[in-house]
């Protein structure tokens, strides 16, 4: 089994880039099996800005205060998860 990290930037791809979910579907059809771990950094950043919550980074990692963690959980288990599942289903992948 392969574990694939699908970053938030990959999910926010522009129209002229290949759909990462379509790439995964082709690998699945070729017999590869994998688990997807998703990120959501850009979506988290947007929600933090919307709520006027400051977020800082240290050595490339988000410093996650309790207030920031509440937003992170909300975004990752809400809109991002639903978007990933919907995108997987659209290309025929089980989710």
Enumerate the predicted regions with their spans.
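Nucleotide/pyrophosphate-binding catalytic subdomain
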Residues: 1-95
């Amino acid at each position: 089994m392969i574990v694939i990290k699908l970053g938030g930037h990959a999910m926010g791809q522009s129209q002229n880039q290949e759909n990462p979910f379509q790439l995964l579907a082709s690998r699945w059809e070729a017999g590869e099996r994998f688990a997807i771990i998703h990120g959501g950094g850009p979506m988290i950043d947007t929600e933090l800005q919307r709520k006027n919550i400051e977020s800082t980074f240290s050595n490339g990692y988000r410093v996650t205060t309790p207030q920031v963690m509440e937003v992170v959980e909300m975004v990752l288990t809400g809109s991002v998860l639903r978007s990933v599942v919907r995108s997987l289903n659209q290309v025929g992948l089980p989710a």
